[in-house]
Amino acid sequence: MAHKKGASSTRNGRDSNAQYLGVKRFGGQVVSAGEIIVRQRGTHFHPGAGVGRGGDDTLFALTPGAVEFGTRRGRRVVNIVAAAAAE
Protein backbone atom coordinates (compact mmCIF):
# COMPACT_ATOMS: atom_id res chain seq x y z
CA MET A 1 0.00 0.00 0.00
CA ALA A 2 1.68 3.14 -1.20
CA HIS A 3 1.49 6.20 0.99
CA LYS A 4 3.05 8.33 -1.75
CA LYS A 5 0.55 8.51 -4.57
CA GLY A 6 3.02 9.30 -7.31
CA ALA A 7 3.91 12.21 -9.57
CA SER A 8 1.25 14.82 -10.47
CA SER A 9 -1.07 13.61 -7.71
CA THR A 10 -2.16 15.75 -4.78
CA ARG A 11 -4.23 15.47 -1.62
CA ASN A 12 -5.13 19.15 -1.66
CA GLY A 13 -7.59 21.12 -3.75
CA ARG A 14 -10.76 20.88 -1.69
CA ASP A 15 -12.57 23.78 -0.08
CA SER A 16 -16.20 24.29 0.83
CA ASN A 17 -18.23 27.28 -0.27
CA ALA A 18 -18.95 30.01 2.27
CA GLN A 19 -22.36 29.67 3.94
CA TYR A 20 -22.96 33.38 4.72
CA LEU A 21 -24.70 32.58 8.01
CA GLY A 22 -25.32 34.93 10.91
CA VAL A 23 -27.42 37.85 12.08
CA LYS A 24 -28.34 40.12 9.16
CA ARG A 25 -30.42 42.73 11.04
CA PHE A 26 -29.43 43.67 14.58
CA GLY A 27 -31.50 44.83 17.55
CA GLY A 28 -33.15 48.20 17.01
CA GLN A 29 -32.88 48.11 13.22
CA VAL A 30 -36.13 48.76 11.35
CA VAL A 31 -37.18 46.05 8.90
CA SER A 32 -39.99 45.57 6.42
CA ALA A 33 -42.04 42.39 6.03
CA GLY A 34 -40.09 39.58 4.37
CA GLU A 35 -36.62 40.82 5.32
CA ILE A 36 -34.20 38.17 6.54
CA ILE A 37 -33.13 38.73 10.15
CA VAL A 38 -30.97 35.66 10.89
CA ARG A 39 -29.52 32.94 8.67
CA GLN A 40 -28.68 29.88 10.76
CA ARG A 41 -28.28 26.12 10.88
CA GLY A 42 -30.59 24.82 13.57
CA THR A 43 -32.54 27.09 15.89
CA HIS A 44 -29.85 29.11 17.65
CA PHE A 45 -32.45 31.89 17.66
CA HIS A 46 -36.17 31.09 17.87
CA PRO A 47 -38.94 33.09 16.19
CA GLY A 48 -41.01 35.35 18.42
CA ALA A 49 -43.79 37.85 17.72
CA GLY A 50 -43.89 38.95 14.09
CA VAL A 51 -41.11 36.57 13.02
CA GLY A 52 -41.38 33.49 10.79
CA ARG A 53 -39.05 30.52 10.33
CA GLY A 54 -38.11 29.10 6.93
CA GLY A 55 -37.37 25.52 6.01
CA ASP A 56 -33.63 26.08 6.54
CA ASP A 57 -34.30 27.75 9.95
CA THR A 58 -33.87 31.25 8.51
CA LEU A 59 -35.75 33.85 10.57
CA PHE A 60 -37.59 36.57 8.65
CA ALA A 61 -39.92 39.45 9.46
CA LEU A 62 -43.65 38.86 9.01
CA THR A 63 -44.55 42.46 9.87
CA PRO A 64 -42.72 45.78 9.54
CA GLY A 65 -41.12 47.15 12.69
CA ALA A 66 -37.94 47.13 14.75
CA VAL A 67 -35.93 44.00 15.55
CA GLU A 68 -35.70 43.04 19.22
CA PHE A 69 -33.59 40.22 20.65
CA GLY A 70 -34.51 38.69 23.99
CA THR A 71 -35.09 35.47 25.90
CA ARG A 72 -38.22 33.44 26.59
CA ARG A 73 -38.17 30.24 28.65
CA GLY A 74 -34.40 30.13 28.45
CA ARG A 75 -34.33 30.42 24.65
CA ARG A 76 -32.98 33.25 22.56
CA VAL A 77 -35.88 34.74 20.62
CA VAL A 78 -36.23 37.43 17.97
CA ASN A 79 -39.31 39.68 18.01
CA ILE A 80 -40.57 42.48 15.81
CA VAL A 81 -42.01 45.44 17.72
CA ALA A 82 -44.05 48.15 16.05
CA ALA A 83 -41.77 50.89 14.73
CA ALA A 84 -43.75 53.58 16.60
CA ALA A 85 -43.35 51.69 19.88
CA ALA A 86 -39.64 51.17 19.24
CA GLU A 87 -38.87 54.89 19.00
Swiss-Prot record:
User: What are the GO MF terms of this UniProt record?
Assistant: structural constituent of ribosome
Q: Which UniProt keywords apply?
A: Ribonucleoprotein, Ribosomal protein
Which Gene Ontology terms describe the biological processes this protein takes part in?
A: translation
Naming one, the record's GO cellular component terms include: cytosolic large ribosomal subunit
Q: Which SUPFAM superfamilies match?
A: Ribosomal L27 protein-like
Q: Kindly list the cysteine pairs connected by disulfide bridges.
A: none
UniProt cross-references to PANTHER family, sorted A to Z: LARGE RIBOSOMAL SUBUNIT PROTEIN BL27M (PTHR15893:SF0), RIBOSOMAL PROTEIN L27 (PTHR15893)
Annotated family: Belongs to the bacterial ribosomal protein bL27 family.
HAMAP family (UniProt xref): Ribosomal_bL27
Protein name per its UniProtKB record: Large ribosomal subunit protein bL27
Query: What gene is behind this protein?
Result: rpmA
